[in-house]
C-alpha cells in the first residue's frame, strides 16, 4: 500500500453497453494499479494534472475541463492527482 488517500469512484450507469463512473481525487489521491478491460473515454470536469504510474514509466498528464480523450482496453496504470486541488472526471467504459 502506498499510504496515499484513495480516489472515490461513483458508478452512475452500469448496463450491457457501458459503465459510467465519476472519479473524485483529493490532492495526492490514487486509484491503485489497475488494467482496463474495456475501451474507455474520460471527460474531465476540472482542470488539473495527473501522475500516471505505468509499467513503461511515470508521466504527467494535463487535464482540461471538457476536453475528452479515448484510450484502448489493456491500459495498465495507477492514476494519482498531482494537483493541489480536487480533480474530477467522468469515465465511460464501452463494453
Curated annotation (Swiss-Prot):
Factors inducing expression: Activated by BauR.
CDD domains in the cross-refs: cupin_BauB-like
GO biological process: beta-alanine biosynthetic process
Residues annotated as domain Cupin type-2: 23-90
Superkingdom assignment: Bacteria
Gene3D superfamilies: Jelly Rolls
Effect of deleting the gene: Cells lacking this gene grow normally on putrescine, cadaverine, and GABA, but growth on beta-alanine is completely abolished.
Function: Involved in the degradation of beta-alanine.
UniProt name for this protein: Beta-alanine degradation protein BauB
Native organism: Pseudomonas aeruginosa (strain ATCC 15692 / DSM 22644 / CIP 104116 / JCM 14847 / LMG 12228 / 1C / PRS 101 / PAO1)
Gene: bauB
Amino acid at each position: 500500500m502506498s499510504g496515499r488517500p484513495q480516489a472515490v469512484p461513483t458508478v452512475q450507469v452500469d448496463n450491457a453497453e457501458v459503465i459510467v463512473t465519476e472519479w473524485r481525487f483529493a490532492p495526492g489521491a490514487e486509484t491503485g494499479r489497475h488494467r482496463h478491460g474495456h475501451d474507455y473515454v474520460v471527460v474531465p470536469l476540472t482542470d488539473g494534472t495527473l501522475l500516471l504510474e505505468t509499467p513503461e514509466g511515470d508521466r504527467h498528464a494535463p487535464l482540461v475541463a471538457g476536453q475528452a480523450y479515448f484510450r484502448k482496453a489493456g491500459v495498465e496504470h495507477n492514476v494519482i492527482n498531482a494537483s493541489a486541488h480536487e480533480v474530477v472526471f467522468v469515465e465511460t467504459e464501452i463494453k
